[in-house]
């Protein structure tokens, strides 16, 4: 028998693994970016796989186009006018965080903007604002109009 998951996936995982509640405002921007990187990657992989079964190398190639720092940097540029004050603040905190690493094949500017984008994704995920996260990703991918095919 399957049980229906009433909450967001993060709340469900915390409940199932008996994790204590945490105030996400206490998370560092890089922690938000860490979880944001994972959930954004999962969403993009789901979109790519949903477009049809193909070779793993092709799936990786298509996914990589959208998860690399340059693509995320371009996405956040498109999204800034759509962000609330709170979302913009989270993005800026992520962008301005001092990261000990840098992405391969990315400028420092793109890498920092991508970190801000990922921090925003992580923040929305941890707040169970999955619909808002998907809405922003659809805008960034050029699919904000109902039923419009993606252009990547």
What are these regions (language model features)?
Residues 1-152:
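Double-stranded RNA-binding/processing signature
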